[in-house]
Amino acid sequence: TFSDDMDGLRKVPDNIPNKEILEKNLHKPLTSVPDPFKKCESFGQHNNEMLKKFLDEFKFNYIFKSSTETYKKGLFNEALLLVLEQYEKINEVILPTLGKERQKTYSPFLPICPDTGKVLEVPVIEIKKKEGKIIYQNGDQKIETEIIDGKCKLQWKVDWAMRWYAFDVDYEMYGKDLIESAILSSKICQILGKKSPNGFAYEMFLDEKGEKISKSKGNGITIEEWLKYASPESLSLY
């Protein structure tokens, strides 16, 4: 079980208390955002604990991995350097799927700002493959950074492929809205030098309005709410 807890907080969910805490920390990795529930060290850790509680209650056999820890401990370093080595080939896969303006600024690498701690989506103006570094433009500053040890993270489609490569993933499930993304990530995994995993696409869960349940909107139902009205066995059906 892998938690994308190094993703930047893009928006404030509607069903979260103390929203001002999150509003002050937008674009920071979830593990760098204070917990609005004031129970854990970070919002990311709160979400991780909720996930592990669910898995434990339903007796899943799992190994938990945190994106933040995996990046910062250097467990992705080899794969990240390979992404840098194959930078041009990966962009050849991604860029045709983007609009013209986005193509001008896209890079697989998202630097972590050394001053604010935010995940930056900024133009990369030079790559240094032998040194394992990139130079990016942040406002009027040109900043050089290593790509390893948690100083950068990857855009999610490249991150997905890199993770498959690093962990030798051979089976992956995803919602049907991610089928096209899985195809792209499979191509990138093959560029990195490994066979992409077998995939299984499942149907989407919809709310009472027939709309997709969104984590950012918070328009779903929690496990605790479900179990107030139904048995654990009923949830196991899903």
Predicted regions and their residues:
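Alpha-helical recognition segments enriched in aromatics with Gly/Pro capping
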Residues: Q86-E92, P96-Y238
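N-terminal Rossmann-like or analogous alpha/beta NTP/dinucleotide-binding catalytic cores
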Residues: T1-N91, S185
